[in-house]
């Protein structure tokens, strides 16, 4: 069998343009795929926000900056210290209200600016390499590619590209078996459940009609001549593409009856190779962790919900009296510390920032805020989890953690000491969680994520 290393100098039949939703949690997995394709010899460019220019360029791919309203700084956007929040009182709104604001500000309003950037990038790439086609790999929530499918014109002489959808979150594609994304209704294939789901979709369509109008308005501003008929978040941003590539495995998803024909699972992203000289900037207590005989619970606060009182401190308190457990707490931001006056327990090790792949090989339980990336890291390392969090895609992630049996889903960003104690005792004391997460880890290894992406590229180019 020819290995990717053997093929690095074999001419590729297309050049690739990655376009991606500007949030860190979307860019990180998309960039993993982009950099691996670059390593395999594909010419790869990445259209991304300027706040991520350094890390995108450092991966080896060609960075193309998003411009104007499309150039979003997500860390500033979500910061409580943002002098210009997306809407007044944003951080005091309920999670689903914030989620709809995010759809408006991140997905819909930037469409015209994103489309201008896409057109400029396609023209530039064609001029650079006129003899090979360009294939666009669009992360699912980058809506700026959609004008292409609704009648908007490309610049004169620019060839229409094939496009692949890369999904790095649970798939937000409408199904008769599921309610709208984020609704607290269960998966159901019964006639009653499907009727309930249909009713929920009708209600959701009415509740989000203003966003649908904004969607159509921004498509029209970008040059579209016709428009999607369904409500927002019905999956148009997936099904418009030639193929849908889902980072994930069937066992983490509901067995829905109506997957789109062009949908396929890739498996989760494989573990990255450790740096040749080891992970840098390890905390001073690192040797204590690697030599411990205790069971290790790793808890991370995350980069969006950054208040340690939400998850880190309650986890430390829940395990304060457990002499058989070592807690590792990751604050999630460089320079972050626990509040002054907090009495740190003797079984807790705390750091501001630590690469998940460095610490999870030592973990017995993984406590986090429910981001899809955190879940995939846990599965890749075979670590069962306790999952908190709300907002964005987190309610859907939590439901899938429960459904798949890989951990306990709490479904709140502030679960409290007692809830965490009960949940941690359950996961530490029941081997079935570890058994299930190992099943999913094996499933993802069998699928070969990067190989499937490359196969999809070759197939779409050959059509």
Task: Please state what every model-predicted region is.
Residues 2-67:
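N-terminal subdomain of nucleotide-sugar transferases
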Residues 2-7, 418-463:
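C-terminal amphipathic helix plus adjacent low-complexity
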Residues 34, 352-400:
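A donor-sugar binding/catalytic signature common to diverse glycosyltransferases
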Residues 62-134, 194-201, 343-344:
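Phosphate/nucleotide-donor binding subsite
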Residues 107-198, 250-253:
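Conserved nucleotide-sugar donor-interacting segment of glycosyltransferase catalytic cores
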Residues 222-266:
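Long, low-complexity segments enriched in small/aliphatic residues
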Residues 247-365:
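Donor-nucleotide binding loops and adjacent catalytic segments primarily
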